């Protein structure tokens, strides 16, 4: 029986993951502008972590919730450890920015003016003119005194606080004022180019808050500015819904979204050299504790680096953009339904294009033989071709049912808008099941054919989002297997009504019996090992923190099952611990694409079973969400999926190995052939498309041009 010391705290494991992302920003072999991108990602990750996870723990402390977590820690103990670890993380973020990235940018023709005092005379004149023309009319200076309450400060906004003293009054008391840095004006302001010490042309940028701070005096004309400092607060953005009581779920979520801007302040970021009196005022008025204050040496909110990554003219300092390749099975003149009837089709994004998924829905919308389209949507893009196709299908008189998950965190507003639009177009829109998030990725197309009705299904590990499909690694299958079609119909009947099938053919659905299915397959390997037979599990996912699953894996390890896990993010399991998990290895791959697919392999006494799905090994996925696990049965496709797992297990460039003490270390690649799995998948996708093209047209053998994605 595993003890509490045999598990890692979920939040601390997440912080370890953010350190792995930060290591990409610190790695000098990573292209310079990619390093900016990775540092920006660590900052946005930390923001969300505070708004959701830290906020939730604070709610537990307020509610005197005493239950301990998987690692035996109370909410208060977790908060203390989180504060210590995140302060260390932030210090490392800024030493990376100040000591490594800023000097490297200067060497490569981009100077960042760190403080407005460093502006040259000409730059200062340009900045002042820019302020008066573009910024000053937008600003709203706010004072705070007995007649004016402390200003309401929105979540995540950047502000400048100031201490003022009335001019020509020696005994005047210090007064507090502030101004919000407007988000409607670009934060990165480009100044006129200059020549560096070698006579090379150099671009120069400064941040908007520095220009405002330089011109604070013009906002408070009758005052002297005693001190001014940028600051930023993070608020509790975690909301809970009483879905049983909510008459209109859509309306209730809209109400809660408004509250999110004004939740309890849970984190304050401010300059490290802040005036003590000014900090005291902020601390008191925001009711924030010392451990939640981050004094920072550098610009607040490093997410601006993503905008800097997007600056024109620096493509030579970025990883070359990869164009997703066409899928060989679809590189012909047949329509998508004819191609699916030839056999199941595996899709591997972003190495292969997401276009076939869009085309599947679009073709169904326009095909006169299609009777119905049913789809679940969790996160979609801002200008979604999938949504457009569903609306077109309804307009063409087809039965269109769409489950839009309104509770997809931070996409609630987006999804509400899409739900309203689809309803107007004539689609049946379902808002999900009470108490459950629908996280499964499934599309069902019902088509009338010569031999009767045929069902076509797309199942995937990732969202129906054509934008993130270029950045996230995911897998999907297009099939017309009658048993999967029957199960797909049952899934949608369960979502739209109250019916639950007596039995499932091939799909495993959470929260009904997916947990049981996983445990059964893990325990089957344990039994094989105990009987002296070869036993092997390979599994890839985003996170693992389910105690029952981890306990079953520990038992399997002790029985001699070889267990190889690829876990990008949170891992509450301890690997390589003698007598507990010596047969378990865990690796995390952090590369140019976000690893997002969920793939599961069980050796099963030399009759291997391979599955893919939408669920991680977490309680929320197995117990509180609608998730789907689907089998890969075609032997050719099974080999391809096993190849994905094996290549990632060979990665020695972007892989980090979990150590028995809970830390992660990069793979030792000395004397080894370098294997970067993401780069290799790109090369393989290009080769497969090229080979397919050549087999059709030998004239293209000399030069192959990757086919551009229509989503670009």
Give the location of each predicted region.
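Cofactor-pocket helix-loop regions in the catalytic cores of large enzyme subunits
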Residues: 542
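N-terminal localization/anchoring segments of enzymes in phospholipid and broader phosphate metabolism
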Residues: 1-537, 555, 559, 571-712
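Glycine/threonine-rich ATP-lid/beta-loop region of ATP-binding domains
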Residues: 547-550, 554
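Hydrophobic alpha/beta core scaffold segments
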Residues: 562-566
């Amino acid at each position: 029986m595993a003890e509490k010391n045999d598990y890692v705290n979920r939040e601390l494991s997440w912080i370890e993951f953010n350190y792995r992302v930060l290591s990409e920003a610190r790695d000098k072999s990573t292209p310079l502008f990619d390093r900016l991108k990775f540092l920006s990602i660590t900052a946005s990750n930390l923001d969300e972590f505070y708004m959701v996870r830290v906020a939730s723990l604070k709610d537990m402390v307020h509610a005197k919730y005493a239950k301990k977590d998987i690692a035996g820690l109370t909410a208060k103990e977790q908060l203390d450890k989180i504060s210590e670890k995140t302060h260390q993380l932030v210090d490392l973020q800024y030493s990376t920015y100040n000591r490594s990235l800023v000097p490297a940018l200067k060497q490569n023709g981009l100077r960042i003016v760190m403080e407005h005092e460093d502006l040259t005379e000409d730059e200062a004149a340009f900045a002042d003119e820019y302020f008066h023309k573009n910024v000053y009319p937008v600003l709203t200076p706010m004072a705070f005194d007995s007649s004016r309450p402390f200003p309401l400060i929105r979540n995540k906004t950047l502000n400048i606080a100031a201490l003022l003293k009335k001019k020509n009054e020696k005994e005047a008391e210090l007064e507090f004022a502030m101004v919000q840095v407007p988000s409607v004006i670009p934060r990165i302001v480009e100044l006129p180019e200059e020549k560096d010490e070698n006579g090379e042309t150099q671009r120069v940028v400064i941040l908007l808050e520095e220009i405002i701070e330089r011109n604070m005096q013009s906002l408070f004309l009758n005052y002297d500015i005693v001190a001014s400092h940028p600051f930023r607060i993070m608020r509790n953005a975690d909301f809970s819904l009483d879905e049983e009581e909510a008459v209109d779920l859509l309306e209730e979520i809209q109400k809660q979204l408004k509250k999110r801007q004004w939740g309890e302040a849970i984190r304050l970021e401010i300059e490290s050299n802040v005036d003590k009196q000014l900090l005291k005022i902020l601390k008191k008025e925001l009711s924030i504790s010392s451990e939640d204050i981050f004094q920072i040496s550098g610009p607040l909110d490093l997410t601006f680096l993503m905008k800097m990554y997007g600056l024109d003219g620096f493509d030579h300092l970025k990883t070359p953009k990869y164009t997703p390749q066409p899928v060989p099975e679809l590189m012909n003149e047949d329509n998508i339904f004819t191609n699916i009837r030839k056999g199941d089709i595996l899709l591997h994004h972003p190495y292969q294009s997401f276009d076939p998924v869009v085309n599947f829905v679009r073709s169904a919308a326009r095909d006169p033989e299609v009777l119905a389209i049913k789809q679940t949507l969790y996160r979609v893009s801002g200008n979604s071709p999938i949504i457009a196709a569903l609306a077109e299908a309804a307009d063409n008189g087809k039965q269109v049912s769409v489950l839009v998950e309104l509770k997809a965190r931070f996409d609630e507003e987006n999804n509400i808008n899409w739900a309203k639009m689809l309803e107007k177009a004539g689609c049946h829109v379902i808002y999900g099941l009470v108490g459950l998030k629908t996280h499964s990725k499934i599309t069902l197309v019902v088509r009338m054919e010569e031999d009767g009705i045929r069902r076509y299904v797309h199942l995937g590990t990732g969202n129906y989002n054509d934008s993130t499909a270029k950045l996230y690694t995911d897998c999907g299958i297009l099939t017309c297997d009658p048993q999967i079609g029957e199960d797909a119909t049952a899934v949608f009947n369960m979502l739209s009504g109250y019916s639950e099938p007596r039995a499932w053919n091939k799909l495993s659905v959470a929260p009904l019996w997916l947990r049981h299915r996983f445990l059964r397959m893990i325990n089957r390997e344990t039994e094989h090992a105990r009987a002296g037979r070869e036993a092997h599990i390979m599994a890839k996912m985003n996170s693992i923190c389910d105690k029952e699953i981890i306990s079953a894996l520990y038992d399997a390890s002790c029985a001699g099952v070889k267990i190889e896990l690829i876990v990008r993010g949170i891992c509450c399991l301890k690997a390589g611990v003698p007598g507990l998990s010596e047969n378990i290895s865990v690796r995390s791959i952090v590369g140019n694409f976000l690893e997002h697919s969920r793939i599961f392999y069980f050796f099963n006494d030399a009759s291997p079973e391979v599955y893919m799905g939408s669920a991680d090994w977490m309680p929320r996925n197995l117990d509180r969400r609608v998730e789907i696990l689907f089998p890969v049965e075609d032997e050719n496709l099974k080999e391809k999926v096993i190849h994905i797992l094996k290549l990632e297990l060979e990665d020695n460039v972007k892989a980090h190995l979990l150590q028995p003490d809970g830390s992660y270390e990069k793979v030792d690649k000395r004397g080894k052939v370098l294997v970067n799995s993401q780069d290799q998948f790109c090369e393989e996708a290009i080769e497969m498309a090229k080979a397919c093209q050549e087999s059709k047209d030998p004239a293209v053998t000399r030069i192959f041009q990757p086919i551009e994605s229509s989503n670009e």
